């Protein structure tokens, strides 16, 4: 696990995403209070956290379990003079330490898969105030019957990945009102995630060329990039924007 974080060190994001998609999803929250209380779950180094601070005048709680990501975000928060509005906290998404009905908005980009889509939606729902929103991105099959190579890769990497229709059924079963959904563009995978990761992999391949264990991990990360380049029309990240009564 430590080497995984060495591979991902200093990446702009810890998963596919981009500021325009964050803004597009945020603009769907038509009844959000003027100064919302926001929880950013699995914030990573916090690119979307800072976007949320720009998009709202609210108070943001950004949580993650990897301290170097939190330290990176805390430094950015202080540099931008946002320390009175953004609290950076070491907490697990599986054990969030907040009272019920604490938040107007729960946000999570490229992270809910850690719990599972349905498990995350059910676990976080009590933290929302009445009429509160939740917006998450989730890896989703774009069409049925994917080729064996991509299916086998994601059966190992994320076996519970579902289709759009299945995820919409989960949202309904969890008693959320669906506001909107949209698929992230391919550039959200490449520009801020895979391109900088590829540069990092290339550097680490030279550094650890005689270390079989680390080379194996680098091969897995490289395979993920190669699979996307070959099969990106079969899967993608969807933004799902929901609200409770």
Segments (PLM) and residue ranges:
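Conserved alpha-helix/loop element of class I SAM-dependent methyltransferases that forms part
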Residues: 16-34
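Short alpha-helix
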Residues: 160-175
């Amino acid at each position: 696990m430590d080497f995984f974080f060495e591979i991902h060190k200093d990446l702009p994001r810890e998963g596919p995403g981009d500021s325009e998609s964050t803004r597009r999803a945020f603009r769907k929250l038509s009844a959000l209070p003027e100064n919302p209380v926001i929880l950013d779950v699995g914030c990573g180094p916090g690119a979307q956290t800072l976007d949320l601070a720009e998009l709202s005048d609210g108070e943001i709680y950004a949580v993650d379990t990897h301290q170097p990501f939190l330290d990176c975000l805390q430094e950015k928060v202080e540099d931008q003079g946002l320390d009175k509005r953004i609290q950076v906290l070491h907490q697990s998404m599986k054990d969030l330490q907040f009272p019920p009905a604490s938040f107007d908005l729960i946000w999570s980009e490229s992270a809910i898969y850690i719990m599972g889509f349905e498990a995350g939606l059910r676990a976080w729902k009590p933290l929302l105030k009445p009429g509160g929103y939740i917006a998450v991105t989730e890896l989703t099959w774009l069409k049925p019957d994917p080729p064996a190579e991509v299916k086998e890769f994601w059966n190992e990497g994320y076996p519970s990945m579902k289709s759009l229709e299945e995820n919409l059924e989960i949202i309904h079963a969890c008693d959320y009102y669906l506001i909107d959904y949209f698929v992230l563009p391919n550039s959200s995978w490449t520009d801020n995630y895979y391109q900088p990761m590829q540069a990092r992999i290339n550097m680490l391949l030279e550094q650890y060329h005689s270390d079989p264990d680390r080379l194996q991990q680098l091969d897995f990360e490289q395979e993920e990039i190669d699979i996307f380049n070959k099969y990106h029309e079969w899967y993608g990240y969807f933004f799902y924007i929901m609200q409770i009564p």
